[in-house]
Amino acid sequence: MRPLAQASQGLFSSVNYVLTDMDETLTFRGRLSAATYGALERLQSAGIRVIPVTGAPAGWCDQMVRMWPVDGVIGENGGFFFQRAAEGHGVTRHFWHADKQADEQERLTVMARKITAQYRWATLAEDQPFRLSSLAFNLPANTTHLGALRQSLHEAGLKTTVNNLWLLAWSGEYDKLIMSRHVLRTFYHLDERAAQDSVFYSGDSENDAPMFAGFRHTLGMSTLRHQRASIPALPAWISQGPGGDGFIEGVDKILEHKRARASRFNAEL
């Protein structure tokens, strides 16, 4: 990881998609600042598509895609993509499991009952009622408990990951990166090779590691330094500030590089 301030001029000039984690990347200590919201608006005003890629529940994602300056939201660590209609207030929902979504949701409900009965200390997150494709457990303070919980979920055939709020579990061969590539290819006709120049991703925790490994332009929030030993893949760049402040640094750098390229192009005319 290198300080973002050291990025060479023009490096991000081809970025047309900003994908970003939400909790403690757009927010800081659970709050979204006006400046961060404004940064999302600045990206859209510059013609850059914005897609949060988050572990957050469907209920949160529905509100985000309807009211925030974003083009869509990938939620519950890749379980679905909610896409805002180009005109009006409509939202189209695309689930990884598609026709099997109801069955998968029931399977997760049964598993949650088993796990909380097996481990009395295991508690579901307050937002679990608003989830459609994942389980979210409050992070145990005891690392032994966390390991036991993950092992039981894996033995049941579920995938798991951790962010700064929850232990997330789901059924299916996907994660943030796999679903992001599917969305970019299916809805924006952007293949993996083209995405290396066109996509910028920002995040702050373990569940962002696949994105850090899968894309060239990646930014970690400054708080990531404290957990770098537990993250399988690190971002190319690190911000100076935490949460939304770090995200704004990335937005400023992208827009600066794009303005410089436009100025050079106009000067050559």
Residues covered by each model-derived region:
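N-terminal glycine-/serine-/threonine-rich phosphate-binding loop
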Residues: 4-48
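Mg2+-dependent phosphoryl-transfer enzymes with acidic/Ser/Thr/Gly-rich catalytic loops
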Residues: 8, 13, 33, 180-269
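Short, well-ordered beta-strand core segments
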Residues: 18, 43, 73, 218-220, ...
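Structural motif
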Residues: 27, 51-53, 202
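Active-site phosphate-binding/coordination module
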Residues: 31-127
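Short, structured coil segments at secondary-structure junctions
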Residues: 68-69, 77, 156, 214-215, ...
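Conserved acidic, metal-coordinating active-site core of Asp-based
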Residues: 111-214
